[in-house]
Amino acid sequence: MVNRLILMVVVVFITDSVMGTAEVMSHVTAHFGKALEECREESGLPVEVMDEFKHFWREDFEVVHRELGCAIICMSNKFELLQDDTRIHHVKMHDYIKSFPNGQVLSEKMVQLIHNCEKQYDDIADDCDRVVKVAACFKKDAKKEGIAPEVAMIEAVIEKY
């Protein structure tokens, strides 16, 4: 009986933790995505790809277009999240994520995942090509870690930004 109770408490804690991080990720995604319209023209991102960006976390959204990498760079620059070499600025990224409700639960993991993906593609010279690969890697790893939000979660908070 005690073992079942302990197991139940652990399951509830893990579920709350995962839901908490996915919920924070929905806020980060919704806010970050607001800069896309400003960056679309500058990056050469086709309108149809831009329209699909709100579905970034869906399984069938392919993170492959070079222009999407350029748009992500532009969007990141709007929030001053990159260093001069277009790699994430760890401190500024932590601060950005922590600025959202309950952001501290996601900050460390998100920066770690992005940094690990950046290391995998560090040899790609073209910034836009590299960033789109990093974004695809981050999406895959975030899903594996259980911190990726459901599209409905993003839609629920998008009006706040």
Curated annotation (Swiss-Prot):
Olfactory tissue; expressed by the glia-like support cells that ensheathe the sensory neurons and line the base of the sensillum lumen. Coiled coil: none annotated. It holds the Pfam family PBP_GOBP. Disulfide bonds join 39-74, 70-128, 117-137. GO terms for molecular function: odorant binding. Gene3D superfamilies: Pheromone/general odorant binding protein domain. Keywords: Disulfide bond, Olfaction, Sensory transduction, Signal, Transport. Residues 1-20 form the signal peptide. GO terms for biological process: sensory perception of smell. Homodimer. Present in the aqueous fluid surrounding olfactory sensory dendrites and are thought to aid in the capture and transport of hydrophobic odorants into and through this fluid. Belongs to the PBP/GOBP family. This is General odorant-binding protein 2. It comes from Manduca sexta. The lineage of its organism: Eukaryota, Metazoa, Ecdysozoa, Arthropoda, Hexapoda. The gene is GOBP2.
